[in-house]
């Protein structure tokens, strides 16, 4: 054992004397002595080991329990949130499905109703067309009959012609008979009948008073001036198939005539209040004129003695109300 000796080995020849070094004096022994004492066998048992690390084991158990509780709580929260979202999704799915079914039912219902209404509308349009054709046939038959009846009358008593039937008083009949019997009518004319009437039958201008014969002004200014129209406008308004435009034109002519008469009455009433309250009012020729009624000429216009004026066209009552006010 080399660690029991110090010094170098010498050959036997050279080693005459040996020096003994003790174990306690060696460095290895010193290192061995510096080590701790070995525990006893009792201390190396399992229960002894767990008793030695009991605090550490307890802390580890507590940490594991805390981690487990936190993980379980988080999992429970996530589970509740997932269930809540699932319930909302189911409710939304039910609503969407309900709305979709309702929309499909409404679409089918409205589609059925629309198809039924379209069929009814087609039937109504067909009925209208058949009625229009029947009306055209009836009108043509009536015109033929009237023409045959008129041909049976003496020459002087016949009504179909420019001398009896004119475009101003009978626009629709004039157009019908002129198209059916063009030989009995002259060339198409505009409504220029007013040009043949005396100038005194129409007022000079709205708001302009006459300083001459006041009685002549009272009679003349109460006549409604007719609307002058050329042949193009006349054809537009008085075409037999254009009844709506004819109604608008009649309404416009009536409103214009009533406005002119009211302004004329205000002018004449301011100059002669006493005379205007007792004077008889002449009826404008366009106010009470029906569509197929012949109206007398302005020289023989009817008065309040032989005709009854309705309330919407009673200019006399309006004049009395203004004077009494």
Curated annotation (Swiss-Prot):
It is found in: Cytoplasmic vesicle; Vacuole; Cytoplasm. Keywords: Coiled coil, Cytoplasm, Cytoplasmic vesicle, Transport, Vacuole. One of its GO terms (cellular component) is cytoplasmic vesicle. The keyword Transport applies. It comes from the Eukaryota. Residues 70-135 form a coiled coil. The keyword Coiled coil applies. Its main location: cytoplasm. Belongs to the VAB2 family. Component of the biogenesis of lysosome-related organelles complex-1 (BLOC-1) composed of at least BLI1, BLS1, CNL1, KXD1, SNN1 and VAB2. Component of the biogenesis of lysosome-related organelles complex-1 (BLOC-1) involved in endosomal cargo sorting. This is Biogenesis of lysosome-related organelles complex 1 subunit VAB2.
């Amino acid at each position: 054992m080399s660690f029991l000796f110090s010094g170098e080995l010498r050959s036997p020849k050279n080693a005459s004397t040996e020096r003994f070094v003790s174990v306690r004096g060696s460095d290895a022994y010193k290192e061995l002595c510096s080590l701790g004492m070995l525990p006893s066998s009792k201390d190396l048992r399992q229960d002894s080991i767990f008793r030695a690390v009991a605090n550490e084991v307890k802390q580890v158990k507590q940490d594991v329990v805390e981690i487990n509780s936190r993980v379980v709580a988080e999992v429970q929260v996530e589970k509740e949130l997932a269930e809540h979202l699932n319930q909302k999704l189911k409710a939304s799915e039910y609503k969407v499905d309900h709305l979709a079914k309702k929309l499909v039912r409404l679409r089918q219902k409205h589609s059925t109703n629309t198809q039924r209404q379209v069929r009814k509308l087609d039937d109504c349009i067909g009925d209208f067309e058949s009625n229009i054709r029947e009306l055209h046939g009836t009108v043509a038959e009536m015109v033929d009959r009237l023409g045959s009846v008129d041909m049976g009358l003496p020459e002087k008593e016949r009504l179909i012609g420019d001398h009896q039937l004119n475009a101003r008083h009978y626009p629709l009949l004039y157009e019908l008979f002129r198209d059916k019997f063009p030989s009995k009518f002259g060339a198409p004319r505009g409504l220029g009948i007013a040009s043949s009437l005396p100038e005194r039958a129409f007022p000079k201008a709205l708001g302009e008073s006459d300083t001459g014969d006041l009685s002549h002004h009272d009679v003349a200014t109460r006549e409604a001036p007719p609307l002058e129209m050329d042949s193009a406008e006349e054809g537009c308004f008085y075409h037999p198939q254009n009844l709506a435009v004819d109604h608008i034109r009649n309404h416009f002519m009536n409103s214009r005539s009533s406005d002119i008469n009211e302004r004329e009455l205000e002018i004449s009433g301011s100059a002669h209040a006493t005379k205007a309250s007792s004077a008889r009012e002449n009826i404008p020729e366009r106010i009470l004129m029906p569509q197929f009624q012949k109206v007398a000429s302005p020289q023989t216009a009817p008065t309040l003695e032989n005709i009854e004026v309705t309330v919407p066209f009673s200019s006399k009552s309006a004049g009395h109300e203004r004077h009494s006010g």
